[in-house]
Amino acid sequence: MELTINGAGKGTVSVSDVAFARDFNEALVHQVVTAYLAGGRQGSKAQKTRSQVSGGGKKPWRQKGSGRARAGTIRSPIWRGGGKTFAATPLDHSQKVNKKMYRAAMQSILSELVRQERLVVVEEMAVEAPKTKQFNAKLKDLGLENVLIVADAVDQNLYLASRNIPHVDVCDAVAINPVSLIAHDKVLVTVSALKKIEEMLG
């Protein structure tokens, strides 16, 4: 299929139908996005059981003859300073997603972006100096506000010029993910980045 390059007389760029003209599979995209978000969860909650609390190796008093209730350790859950009976453990929230499924979901998302005219292709996206004002002017010319910019390689000037603008993110072609593609109103891709994405997903 052919995608139009934004700009007067820029022409078109040919891309694979496999990566950019696939039917939208909502269930698969939902599964992959959920798995991606789950993988970012920390899951760092932890408490100590009686065996993990420091101390308590010695029996506090002898088993019989003292008249007191029998006790084997001062770290019993019923004692102050003891372990937790049912201690919380760190959780791994990650979900398994096969490479084939992930690739198909990414193809599905990109194809839907093309159908909804949310994918903007440009020859290149670069700024001469790390100036936010210059970069903002470029975005205004293209009529973009909430946008993900995908470049073949993000140089220092582009990164510094864009990092302070709300709702604008910049990434390399190899770093695209399902959540960032969906989250932005528009996705601006350079021709070289488009070819790299096609190579990865085609």
Curated annotation (Swiss-Prot):
Signal peptide range: none
Q: Which Gene3D superfamilies match?
A: 3.40.1370.10
Keywords, A to Z, come to: Ribonucleoprotein, Ribosomal protein, RNA-binding, rRNA-binding
Per the record, which residues fall in region Disordered?
40-71
Gene Ontology biological process terms in this record? translation
**What GO CC terms are in its UniProt record?**
ribonucleoprotein complex; ribosome
GO molecular function annotations of the record: rRNA binding; structural constituent of ribosome
Question: Biased-composition ranges for Polar residues?
Answer: 44-53
Summary of subunit composition and partner proteins = Part of the 50S ribosomal subunit.
- Function of the protein: One of the primary rRNA binding proteins, this protein initially binds near the 5'-end of the 23S rRNA. It is important during the early stages of 50S assembly. It makes multiple contacts with different domains of the 23S rRNA in the assembled 50S subunit and ribosome.
State the family named in the UniProt similarity comment for this chain: Belongs to the universal ribosomal protein uL4 family.
Q: What is this protein called?
A: Large ribosomal subunit protein uL4
